[in-house]
Amino acid sequence: MNKIQIPWEERPVGCTDVMWRYSQNPVIGRYHIPSSNSIFNSAVVPFKDGFAGVFRCDNKAVQMNIFTGFSKDGIHWDISHEPIQFKAGNTEMIESEYKYDPRVTWIEDRYWVTWCNGYHGPTIGIAYTFDFVDFFQCENAFLPFNRNGVLFPQKIDGKYAMLSRPSDNGHTPFGDIYISYSPDMKYWGEHRCVMKVTPFPESAWQCTKIGAGSVPFLTDEGWLLFYHGVITTCNGFRYAMGSAILDKDHPEKVLYRTREYLIGPAAPYELQGDVPNVVFPCAALQDGERVAVYYGAADTVVGMAFGYIQEIIDFTKRTSII
């Protein structure tokens, strides 16, 4: 992949936050394509001389599916009007009740896509593509029930690695982050607990459930992971974004984890929508010094936030609950 310029906007004058929102948010509105009721919780990666993405688009019947999109600058997007049509050796794998919350990463020679796949309940679907035109679906990673499958962008000790959040069949009122390994992207094992919810009130914004967000990327300190945390309030679930640093060689070991959230729902498009009070990270573009994070806002639109990687690392270490 070619190294390209990530989307970027400097910190506003007077802003002291570690991360800040794009001034023109939302980047993608709910009616970006004719059929959509909402577009959110979507994945973006560098591709050729621009960017490609896999987008969660719920239609006006609120059927959940994933669509491809392309952009020159990571801000202005051309999203397909039709969902991805997968190819698979086992045709049963193509049938699903829903597909949502995709993540995408490049590993070695192809792009890998994961998503929440409705196969007798929520599990993690896996597919690969070389060109974002043809997609080849593999076996589901796990039995139901599981969500938030996030692959590491390189093998660890010769094996693929994936974060996930085992759950139940409903709108999960619990959940911790686990890691699993695979020699071939088909058979998964060596399951280890990575992060658990925090006890109330030590870090209450993440005391109900947590889940991996964007694909982690390697820094001098270890793997930097953005994740979501949830608290149950009188007004329902509230989703915010935090960060953690995982050991480079043994990512089941958490070195640092934020006590305070990086971004919580505060802007109107995060507070109001189909599911109010949600900031849900799904993708991060970085150039070694800076990062642009794409997140779902109120389960309705896509927002973007920026930050300097070293400042985020410093914040993660300074506020760590570990």
Curated annotation (Swiss-Prot):
Family that this chain belongs to: Belongs to the glycosyl hydrolase 130 family.
Domain of life the protein comes from: Bacteria
Cited SUPFAM superfamilies: Arabinanase/levansucrase/invertase (SSF75005)
Annotated protein name in UniProt: 1,4-beta-mannosyl-N-acetylglucosamine phosphorylase
Catalysis performed (reactions): 4-O-beta-D-mannopyranosyl-N-acetyl-D-glucosamine + phosphate = alpha-D-mannose 1-phosphate + N-acetyl-D-glucosamine
Annotated EC: 2.4.1.320
Cysteines paired by S-S bonds: none
pH dependency: Optimum pH is 5.5.
Physiological role: Involved in the N-glycan catabolism by catalyzing the reversible phosphorolysis of beta-1,4-D-mannosyl-N-acetyl-D-glucosamine (ManGlcNAc) in a sequential mechanism to yield N-acetyl-D-glucosamine (GlcNAc) and alpha-D-mannose 1-phosphate. It can also use beta-1,4-D-mannosyl-N-acetyl-D-glucosamine-N,N-diacetylchitobiose (ManGlcNAc2) and N,N-diacetylchitobiose (GlcNAc2) as substrates.
Keyword tags: Carbohydrate metabolism, Glycosyltransferase, Transferase
GO molecular function term, any single one: glycosyltransferase activity
Binding partners and assembly: Homotetramer.
